[in-house]
Design a protein with these regions (language model features):
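Short loop or secondary-structure boundary microenvironments that flank
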Residues: 359, 363, 405, 433, ...
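P-loop NTPase motor domains
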Residues: 25, 133-427, 442, 452, ...
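Extended alpha-helical interface modules used as scaffolds for assembling large macromolecular complexes
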Residues: 505, 544-547
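Basic- and hydrophobic-enriched, low-structure N-terminal and domain-boundary segments
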Residues: 1-145, 149-152, 477, 488-489
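General secondary-structure edge motif
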Residues: 92-94, 119, 131, 135-136, ...
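Short secondary-structure boundary/capping segments
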Residues: 179-182, 204-205, 445-449, 473-478, ...
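A broad, low-specificity signal for short, low-complexity segments enriched in glycine/proline
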Residues: 95-104, 113-114, 119-129, 149-150, ...
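Conserved ATP-driven motor cores of ASCE-family P-loop NTPases powering translocation/secretion/packaging/pilus
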Residues: 419-521
Length: 611
């Protein structure tokens, strides 16, 4: 707002110069014709009565020149005196922005589907190069504040690109799956509640570094206490990483295609029985020994050899710990999920696709797979953007990650760095929190960096005092005038009023707490905050494809304009049930010699049995 005020003041000073020039010309005329104060006053009165009676005289240039020199000098001295003063902003310049004006600056005028819905009246265009803001959004709202209803669902129904949803309980999958398919988005489901869908992390390993990352994620995301690192724990962790990395590298380079999965890794771990007699060899020792004879510099051999430097007792403890931490891989249903893959992660960057990752909201047993999925998703998309010349480092389809339960699920180790560089690849993240304490406890040193890397913040309400304080400070302080009054009583009573300038939070923590449940706060980097209504889900034209449109629950449907469902359209009864096995078309494209006719026939029979 400051540049606009300065521009207005400049025009005001320029406008004031015109009457001064008129007065100077009038005084020049009067002083030539009149002598004495009375005559001067009479001439000035006559001039005021007839302003157009000015005449050019010999003194006029002198008077005009004096004004043109002295006036700018006087203005300069005045402004110099006022340089360190900001009238009305002495204690803060925070103020509320206008939602509709903000929307005009940031909405997508050409294509309203290519927008992020922040509130009822505020949109943010997906074209980040136009408005110079990244598309990362922090959403803060307590339980029941409407994070899903007022933010996730409206933005998913935009169907503007590719999406990854972390979906506790599967609510989003059921609500949005059919609508997204209706709008041309290919939907894939990986369900860790009912164990449906297929995701094989080994399928995305292309380099030794990828294998090391997977081993690291398996070790640190399955620990009972991930924060307990350093000292003796650090030695055990690094040894476990080397052990798992050696197995994964062997699977990657030496196993047939149909055995390249984590189930094979678990089978290999169970074969590693360490004897206290250093001369006894287990089956893995023999396997890696044969590989070493064939290729002494094989990456799997190098990792296994480094791991075997420990004592027999140490190695045995590491293996027992690995089996304990990875016990979930011994579940038959889970093992079947990770045997094959149908996620096709890189395709999110080149065509409209949506992946729904369903997780239980009361059990974190399989959360380590979400972390691996996040890690590989970023890795695959970054590599696709950087290694495809025609993309010029930017994916052709925008990929958006709706990271619900952000504080309760492990994220990639270098997530802070990923968030900072994702924008240039046309990737954005929606970080969804219940309160600010969650991200503080998870990222003790980096939580401010994460929020700082998100140019938009939406606050939906809640009941956490630390969040109230944070939002209040984020809104800033405004300058207000206060009135003081003193009254003296008695026979000579008197009263006096005094005014002074002081500072006040735009919203105090208590006012943030008492904010209406229908309201939300929207903050975009470099803009004044906006207080607006939460988005009315029933205003979205694609709602007609969802069960929410027909649901009697909720109050907003009473105020919505009815939209008839399209002729012949029926809602899938259970979208998650459509999650099948690996695509036969994909298998047919593979040219690896391990894909035999028998295997292909077996896969075909398997798929037909699911229909």
């Amino acid at each position: 707002m400051r540049p606009n005020k300065d521009r207005q003041n400049l025009w005001l000073w320029a406008a004031l110069l015109l009457p001064l020039l008129w007065l100077a010309a009038g005084l020049a005329q009067i002083t030539e014709q009149a002598h004495g104060l009375s005559a001067l006053a009479a001439g000035l009165t006559a001039l005021l009565n007839d302003p157009l009676s000015l005449r050019w005289c010999s003194s006029t240039p002198k008077f005009l020149l004096a004004v043109l020199v002295l006036y700018p000098l006087g203005v300069y001295c005045y402004l110099l005196d006022q340089a360190d003063r900001r009238p009305g902003e002495e204690h803060g310049s925070a103020h509320w922005g206008n939602a509709k004006e903000l929307n005009e600056r940031y909405r997508n005028r050409k294509d309203p589907w290519q927008e992020i819905i922040l509130s009822q009246n505020v949109r943010l265009s997906n074209d980040s190069y136009r408005h110079q803001r990244n598309l990362h959004v922090v959403v803060i709202g307590g339980s029941g504040s409407g994070k899903t209803r007022f933010f996730v669902k409206p933005n998913a129904l935009q169907c503007s690109g590719s999406y990854f949803f972390l979906d506790p309980k599967g609510e989003l999958t059921y609500s949005l799956g059919g609508a997204m398919e209706e709008n041309g988005v290919t939907v894939t489901v990986i369900d860790f509640v009912h164990f449906r869908g297929h995701y094989n992390p080994v399928a995305y390993l292309k380099t030794d570094e990828n294998a090391m990352k997977l081993a690291y994620a398996l070790v640190f995301n399955t620990k009972k206490n991930p924060a307990a690192s350093g000292g003796e724990n650090e030695f055990w962790d690094k040894s476990a990483v080397m052990f798992l990395a050696s197995l994964i590298l062997y699977i990657l380079y030496e196993s047939p295609l149909y055995e390249r999965n984590l189930n094979t890794m678990m089978d290999m771990i169970l074969e590693c029985k360490v004897s206290e007699d250093s001369y006894d060899e287990n089956r893995m020792d023999i396997l890696f020994g044969e590989l070493e004879q064939r290729d002494p510099h094989h990456p799997a051999v190098l990792q296994y050899r480094s791991f075997k430097l420990g004592s027999a007792k140490t190695l045995s403890s590491i293996m027992v710990t690995a089996v304990s931490n990875l016990h979930m891989l011994q579940s038959a249903a889970f093992a079947e999920m990770i045997a094959t893959d149908e996620m096709f992660l890189p395709k999110l960057g080149v065509e409209k696709r949506a992946i729904f990752c369903v997780i239980p909201d009361n059990d974190d047993t399989f959360n380590f797979m979400v972390s691996i999925l996040y890690t590989q998703l970023f890795d695959q998309l970054f590599r696709l953007a950087d290694s495809t010349p025609e993309f010029h480092g930017t994916l052709p389809v925008h990929v958006r990650l709706m990271m619900d339960e952000f504080a309760n699920v492990a994220t990639p180790e270098n997530f802070v760095k990923i968030l900072a560089v994702a924008r240039s690849r046309n990737i954005s993240c929606d970080i969804i929190l219940q309160n600010i304490s969650q991200i503080k406890s998870k990222y003790k040193d980096d939580w401010e960096t994460i929020i700082g890397n998100c140019d938009s913040l939406v606050y939906l309400g809640g009941n956490d005092y630390s969040t109230f304080e944070y939002i209040s400070k984020l809104l800033g302080k405004q300058t207000i005038r206060t009135k003081g009054q003193s009254i003296g009583k008695g026979s000579h009573g008197s009263s006096s009023d005094s005014y002074q300038v002081t500072g006040r939070e735009l919203m105090t923590p208590d006012e943030v707490r008492r904010m209406k449940r229908s309201d939300c706060l929207v903050m975009i980097s470099g803009e004044a905050p906006v207080r607006d209504k939460k988005y009315n889900l029933f205003d979205h034209p694609n709602l007609k494809y969802t069960p929410d449109y027909r649901s009697p629950r909720g109050l907003l449907h009473r105020f919505a304009t009815p939209i008839p469902a399209p002729d012949g359209y029926t809602m899938p009864p259970d979208y998650m049930a459509q999650a099948g096995t690996v695509s036969l078309a994909y298998v047919a494209e593979l040219t690896s010699p391990e894909i035999t006719e028998d295997l292909y026939d077996e896969l075909q029979e398997w798929e037909e049995s699911l229909l």
